[in-house]
Design a protein with these regions (language model features):
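Compositionally biased terminal segments of proteins
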Residues: 1-141
């Protein structure tokens, strides 16, 4: 069993949420990078989570959000767009904090759970965690 197959099993993702979201990003040339626990998987042993955290470029955020509305269930908060789908326990969290915008400039394509994805550099992954902790927005594990 591959890491990706294991993720699909753990998240009971029968809706292919992650694949559909990544296709939407790719097909619409929306720049993004992975942050959070899944990004850590690019630098260490795989971390399996029910959340995939992303950052999308600020100037494409409005268009991206309108594209999501036709395909996914969306919950918007001041700093986050939570994307879910029926038949999946997986959540994609698009962080909208403007401090994260520069992360894409330093992101590199890396192997994450058997997928080649743009991943924030390790310093930015840590920086995002520190900011979320300081702001009180970090999810409790």
């Amino acid at each position: 069993m591959t890491t990706f197959q294991f993720l699909k099993s753990v998240t009971a993702d029968k809706s292919n949420l992650l694949e559909r979201l990544l296709k939407l990003l790719h097909d619409n040339n929306i720049r993004y990078c992975v942050i959070g626990g899944v990004a850590v998987s690019a630098y260490a042993e795989p971390v399996i989570s029910l959340d995939v955290d992303l950052v999308v470029t600020n100037y494409q955020l409005g268009r991206f959000e309108s594209l999501l509305a036709n395909t996914f269930l969306i919950k918007r908060t001041p700093r986050l767009i939570e994307i879910t789908a029926a038949n999946s326990r997986l959540r994609a969290n698009v962080h909208t904090d403007s401090r994260l915008a520069d992360f894409m400039e330093r992101a590199e394509i890396r192997n994450v759970m058997d997928m080649q994805l743009p991943v924030a550099c390790i310093e930015d992954v840590l920086r995002a965690q520190v900011w979320q902790f300081e702001d009180g927005t970090r999810k409790r594990s």
